[in-house]
Amino acid sequence: MKIRNILGLSAVAVALGVGLTACGSKNNSQSSNDAKTQTLNLAASTRLDTIDISKAGGYGSTGNVYESFYRLGEKGSITPGLATKGYSSKDGKTWTFKLRDAKFSDGSPITANDFVYSWRRTVTPSTKAQYAYLFNAVKNGDAIRSGKMNPDKLGIEAVDKHTVKIHLTKPVAYFKTLMAYPLFGPQSEAAVKKYGDKYGTNSKYMVYSGPFKMINWNGTGDKWAYVKNNQYWDKKVVKLNRINYSLVSNPATSLNLYNQGSIDITPLATDQLKNYQNDPNLKDYSYSMISYLRYNFNDKDAQKKAIINNDNIRRAISLSINRSVLSQKVLYLKSDPITGFVPKGLARDPETGKDFADQQGVKDTLDYNPKLAKQLWNKGLKELGVKNISLNLLTSNENANSTVATQYLKEQLESNLSGLTLNLTSVPSKIASQREQSGDFDISLDTWGGDFNDPITFLQIPQRGTSYNYGKYNSKKYNDLVNQAENVDANDASKRWQDLVNASKELNLTQGVSPLFQDDTYYLKQPKVEGVIHNTAGTQWNYKYTYIK
């Protein structure tokens, strides 16, 4: 999941899908009323840009209004969704799903054809779906996405009204988990045609398949709400009647509203967290999210391109950063020291149960070693035939955390690497993202959050040809290892795992990206709120079983 606000609380809140209600203090009678009406009040740090599942840039909370074959339960478990069962062929290349009797929020039946239509719509190039690459393993998905084949050739078919069959080009180890992602859910062709260009631009121009449906969102507004979807197949277990959201971009304002009782959950900025360490309502609702330095290997400036493509220069930059100080003293994070591009807690070895993050580390890559850094730096300067280097670090200006982190990086790098000038370029997150996509940067401070609980959700990002590989990192060894994992060894869990471990080690050795820290996010939650399901990847917030006591 690409986090638009490059580092910072706003980015985290967007990823986590937190949302909110109107300002003002609540008394006990109002809190009691929330219990009677089963109303949850949340804060959103940024406006929604779309509710079209084909075009969305993330699905942190939209799993509450959309549903696929499965949905994520506690600790990333796969729980029933629109399918009553799903099974694969012996070679892992064919999946069959049996659908339950279910309806969209407008009362129309959800059928196998709605899945077929949805998938075809998403991979159609003109849709410009950000996550279309996740369909590459579906037969003809890559060819369709690149405009070489018609969408009706996609490897998905409606065998009958309640049976969907999917044909893959290779086994996908995490396919079942992927099928819990709203991206792969059904869309009503009738609704898309009815609303035309308006589809997904307003809450009333959409039909919903999840526990809730959205109301009062006009595409740009500061307030919207989820209300119980009375057409939902499992509506009997849904206790909340309404979830109110309001835009509150300032962390201090959000915290004040929480303390007044106006909102029920609020994220804490780093400068706020230190004052709530012992609060009984403090909750660790972290996301599998890595903040890292992205290098532009295809820099438009020829001299800078040569600098960035020098292995010694990149390793020197990485070894000059004291990550422990940055995460624990500067940003007040509690997460373990980072070991590579895959965060801790995302995935475990299928044989030993060991965390992937404990296996990917490589000495003298992410350590703080200023002595070795200087040696490599001087070697790189000599190879380049220069004595001084000036590079620009691109970041977002939409949160104070970004400013703090980049100032620390500038101080560390310039003090440890003689001849380096690091210029900070701080712009709105939307502009930063546009500049990355157009290749208009030297180095950027970026963030990625896991879409599902498998290392590939991170390791596919620096792979050649991936749409999010804005820096154009291209290592033959790295690409070969990832391809080996996803093709030759795709049906052998142990071999695939080792391929990915080796790929992550190669990424460390080459510093194709320089991981900085794993974000951890703490929230305050009102004790009256129960049943919130939180996951570290994918659809992070599940309010299906939430209630106000």
Predicted regions and their residues:
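Structural transition elements
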Residues: S335-K379, A400-S402
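Ligand-site clamp/hinge motif
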Residues: N230-Y276
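Ligand/substrate-recognition segments at binding pockets and active sites
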Residues: G219-G221, P370-G450, T521
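A structural "hinge/loop" feature
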Residues: A44-G60, L82-T84, F175-G185, K304-I307, ...
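Surface-exposed binding/hinge segments that line
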Residues: A132-A190
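N-terminal lobe/hinge region of extracytoplasmic solute-binding protein
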Residues: A43-K90, T127
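Gly/Pro-rich hinge or "lid" segments in bacterial periplasmic/extracellular proteins
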Residues: V172-V237, R242
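Extracytoplasmic/peripheral linker and loop segments enriched in polar/acidic and small residues
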Residues: G419-A432, L459-Q526, K549
